[in-house]
């Protein structure tokens, strides 16, 4: 049993400390690395309105003669307040914790307390994964038995599939045999868009990305890094000039968009963000600890009409 190995002090991070933890993890997220646009201070439903102008030049004449077109597109972003309430037995993690701390000590390092280790190495890592999962895949109509947190809002994929202006490509179960063709089909739709597609990325699930690599390997001898319409530069693969990005988007889903078109909203100022870990042994006599976290997230798309998404598989 784990009890009596150590005396644990409860951990509470709130106010500025909690804000710093929250923001630090946001900016170390893979989403930031993808180039997703971050928008702070989203306290309530917020309108995202953007405009473009075109057809500006005309033949010179003396009088002022208005000419040109302005196109407005609006969408909304709304924050969702989320929380974590977790109770776990120390025994579930104690052996791993002791092994890690022994390794640290033998290497001349300073061992962590159990709560600090659990918070930094277990809790935060899982929170980052689920936060990214929410960003891409949240769906208020979700009915799955796992990942129930996806019901908390509507993520990027749900919003794009429901937007009248976005371009849809029929979704299929992606396999090694068809993944290159389906990525090519999405890329072809991007080329049909009227806007500048410089900087666009194609987002796919990690598993589908590996299928793509396998398919490329089957279509290329030796170590050639250039295929028909696909190239490799270092660790990155480009399809039709666009980087293919593996991420936590659901399997069999492809989204093509400029990453700055996709918004991750949040609020830290005057919010209720907090992180707490409480030892229950002196309170309930159970050999457990509780974790309580309050956070928030908002997802939005500025220009749905400039994005391409595969439809849900029927």
Pin down the residues of each PLM region.
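Sequence/fold signature of self-assembling virion shell proteins
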Residues: 2-56, 150-174, 211-314
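Assembly/oligomerization interface modules of large self-assembling protein complexes
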Residues: 18-100
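Helix N-cap / beta->alpha transition motif
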Residues: 85-93, 100, 205-208, 257-259, ...
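Active-site-proximal structural scaffolding
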Residues: 86, 116, 202-205, 284
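Short helix/loop capping segments that flank catalytic or ligand/cofactor-binding pockets
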Residues: 96, 132, 211-213
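Alpha-helical scaffold segments that mediate packing/assembly in large oligomeric complexes
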Residues: 102-185, 310-314
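Extracellular structured ligand-interaction cores
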Residues: 120, 197-199, 288
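Ordered core of a single globular domain
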Residues: 174, 180-220
């Amino acid at each position: 049993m784990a009890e009596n190995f150590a005396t644990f002090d409860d951990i509470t991070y709130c106010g500025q400390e909690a804000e710093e933890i929250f923001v630090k993890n946001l900016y170390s997220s893979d989403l930031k690395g993808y180039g997703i646009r971050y928008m702070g201070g989203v306290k309530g439903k917020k309108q995202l309105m953007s405009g473009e102008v075109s057809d500006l030049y005309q033949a010179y004449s003396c009088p002022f003669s208005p000419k040109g077109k302005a196109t407005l597109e609006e969408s909304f972003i709304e924050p969702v307040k989320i929380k974590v309430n977790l109770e776990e037995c120390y025994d579930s993690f104690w052996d791993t914790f002791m092994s890690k701390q022994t390794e640290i000590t033998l290497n001349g390092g300073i061992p962590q307390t159990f709560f600090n280790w659990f918070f930094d190495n277990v809790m935060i890592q899982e929170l980052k994964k689920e936060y990214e999962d929410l960003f891409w895949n949240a769906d208020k109509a979700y009915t799955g038995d796992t990942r129930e947190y996806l019901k908390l809002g509507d993520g990027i994929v749900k919003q794009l599939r429901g937007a009248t202006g976005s371009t849809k490509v029929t979704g299929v179960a992606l396999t090694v045999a068809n993944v290159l063709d389906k990525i090519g089909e999405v890329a072809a739709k991007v080329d049909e868009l009227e806007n500048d597609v410089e900087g666009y990325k194609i987002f796919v699930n990690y598993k589908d990305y590996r299928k793509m690599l396998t398919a490329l390997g089957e279509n290329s001898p030796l170590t050639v890094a250039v295929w028909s319409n696909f190239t490799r530069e270092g660790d990155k693969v480009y399809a039709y000039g666009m980087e293919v990005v593996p991420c936590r988007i659901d399997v069999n889903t492809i989204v093509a968009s400029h990453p700055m078109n996709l918004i991750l909203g949040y609020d830290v100022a005057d919010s209720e963000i907090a992180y707490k870990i409480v030892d229950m042994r002196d309170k309930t006599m159970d050999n457990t600890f509780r974790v309580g976290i309050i956070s928030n997230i908002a997802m939005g798309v500025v220009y749905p009409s400039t994005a391409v998404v595969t439809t849900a598989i029927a």
